[in-house]
């Protein structure tokens, strides 16, 4: 006797075939790895020494702990009112406010990328590539700081740059609309 599809759940018959269930059960879990970076060989379970050795905690570093968290929150909270002020004003911000906004935004980006590198390119797994990533982050931040200096001294700053890009796109759109008429 053939039952309609909606009635199969009442009879206790399987709706899914066994092959489908096996396919779900046979998938292997794979940890996140970066395909183009070589990894260091790891001991099983990440245990150094023997399992009976006492745990040796890493040395405390407040810059990577509580101070890091406080600085991250200070950067985030200082950027929000400055970004709001920059959006609400019609002209460019003062040089001091724009410089402070740019440096705080750069500091916040630095700390967040630092956290990403620490989490996903760990020194234990990737070895020297962790240090290379940190050097590249520092170099990129220094170049960005120089770029902020050039924007502040030669133009209206970062906020002026964003506003000029926004205005130019509005002018381009209005010119396209007028050209269609």
UniProtKB/Swiss-Prot annotation:
Q: Which GO BP terms sit in this record?
A: cellular respiration; mitochondrial electron transport, succinate to ubiquinone; tricarboxylic acid cycle
Pathway in which the depicted protein is active: Carbohydrate metabolism; tricarboxylic acid cycle
Which Pfam families does UniProt cross-reference here? CybS
So what does mutating residue 109 to A actually do?
Answer: Decreases SDH cytochrome b content
**Keywords for this protein:** Electron transport, Heme, Iron, Membrane, Metal-binding, Mitochondrion, Mitochondrion inner membrane, Quinone, Transit peptide, Transmembrane, Transmembrane helix, Transport, Tricarboxylic acid cycle
Give yes or no: UniProt keyword Transport.
yes
- Where, per UniProt, does this protein localize? Mitochondrion inner membrane
- Single annotated GO MF: metal ion binding
Q: Cellular component per GO?
A: mitochondrial inner membrane; mitochondrion; respiratory chain complex II (succinate dehydrogenase)
Chief location bin: mitochondrion
Its function, per the record, reads:
Membrane-anchoring subunit of succinate dehydrogenase (SDH) that is involved in system II of the mitochondrial electron transport chain and is responsible for transferring electrons from succinate to ubiquinone (coenzyme Q). SDH3 and SDH4 form the membrane dimer that anchors the catalytic dimer formed by SDH1 and SDH2 to the matrix surface of the mitochondrial inner membrane. Electrons originating from the catalytic dimer enter the membrane dimer for ubiquinone reduction.
| Similarity remark | Belongs to the CybS family.
UniProt miscellaneous comment: Present with 7920 molecules/cell in log phase SD medium.
Q: What name has this protein been given in UniProt?
A: Succinate dehydrogenase [ubiquinone] cytochrome b small subunit, mitochondrial
| Underlying gene | SDH4
């Amino acid at each position: 006797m053939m039952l309609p599809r909606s009635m199969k759940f009442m009879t206790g018959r399987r709706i899914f075939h066994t092959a489908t269930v096996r396919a779900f059960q046979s998938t292997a879990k794979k940890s996140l790895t970066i395909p183009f970076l070589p990894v260091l060989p790891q001991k099983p379970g990440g245990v150094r020494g023997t399992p009976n050795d006492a745990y040796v905690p890493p040395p405390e570093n407040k810059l990577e702990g509580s101070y890091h968290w406080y600085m991250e929150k200070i950067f985030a909270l200082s950027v929000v009112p400055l970004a709001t002020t920059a959006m609400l004003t019609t002209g460019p911000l003062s040089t001091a406010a724009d410089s402070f906004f740019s440096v705080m935004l750069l500091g916040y980006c630095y700390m967040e990328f630092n956290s990403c590198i620490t989490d996903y390119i760990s020194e234990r797994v990737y070895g020297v590539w962790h240090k290379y990533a940190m050097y590249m982050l520092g170099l990129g931040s220094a170049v960005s700081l120089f770029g902020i200096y050039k924007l502040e001294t030669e133009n209206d700053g970062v906020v002026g740059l964003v506003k000029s890009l926004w205005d130019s796109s509005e002018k381009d759109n209005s010119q396209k609309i007028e050209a269609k008429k």
